């Protein structure tokens, strides 16, 4: 196994297993934390600023069984395909490939019509979802923000590695495009969560009360995301 530092330097672990581990150095961290990057499908190790190589290597070796077991359990990556049924902004639709159509990608009631060659279908569906999300997520977020007397500076749709959303101190909100594939109540929860950060840049009791005021079923949405979120990352 090879560990790659932020500096670009690498060093080998004794029992090489042919995979890379990303290392993130954090000045605010006092302990080592290991997790799996769902998008890149690699282990990520967060270490304190002055962590030694030996300590990092020992920690990885001690958790080797967990790393291999967790990687093995990751679902296979998925491509959008003709005839596939997906949830799209809370509606069940069927992806329908029509090579000779001249529509690009369009939604026709419960069918998502995709034109062009089959080799472009996955990319076209993904691009459509991201473009549509800009409007759908913007409208819902602005509506929720108005309810708590806040304004959003900017909303962006991202292809993030692990986060479903984020809200900066400048009132800029980012959303992961994959959340469009979740049930509507999950989308509602995430929007309420990030919009609440406009008022509370923490996860205090006041923050969760704000979330609850915007979405009474927020716990249902959060539970679904915690349990099923990894499945959404099979789409890349």
Named regions from a protein language model:
Residues 194:
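Walker B catalytic acidic pair
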Residues 1-188, 198-236:
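Active-site-proximal or metal-binding-adjacent scaffold patches in catalytic folds
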Residues 191:
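Walker B beta-strand of ABC/ABC-like P-loop ATPase nucleotide-binding domains
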């Amino acid at each position: 196994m090879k560990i790659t530092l932020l500096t670009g330097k690498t060093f080998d672990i004794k029992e090489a297993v042919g995979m890379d581990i990303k290392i993130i150095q954090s000045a605010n961290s006092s302990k080592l934390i290991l997790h799996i990057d769902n998008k890149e499908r690699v282990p990520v190790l967060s270490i304190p600023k002055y962590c030694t190589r030996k300590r990092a290597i020992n920690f990885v070796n001690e958790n080797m069984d967990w790393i291999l077991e967790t990687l093995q359990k990751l679902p296979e990556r998925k491509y959008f395909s003709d005839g596939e049924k997906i949830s799209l902004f809370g509606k069940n639709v069927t992806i329908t490939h029509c090579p000779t159509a001249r529509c690009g990608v369009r939604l026709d009631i419960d069918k998502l019509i995709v034109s062009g060659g089959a080799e472009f279908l996955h990319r076209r569906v993904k691009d459509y979802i991201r473009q549509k999300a800009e409007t759908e997520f913007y409208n819902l977020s602005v509506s929720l923000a108005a309810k708590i007397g806040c304004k959003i500076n900017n909303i962006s749709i991202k292809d993030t590695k692990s986060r479903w959303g984020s809200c900066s101190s400048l009132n800029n909100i980012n959303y992961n495009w994959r959340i469009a594939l979740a049930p509507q109540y999950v989308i509602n929860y995430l929007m309420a969560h990030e919009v609440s950060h406009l008022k509370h840049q923490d996860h205090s009791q006041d923050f969760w009360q704000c979330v609850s005021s915007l979405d009474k079923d927020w716990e249902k949405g959060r539970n679904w995301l915690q349990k099923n979120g990894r499945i959404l990352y099979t789409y890349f």
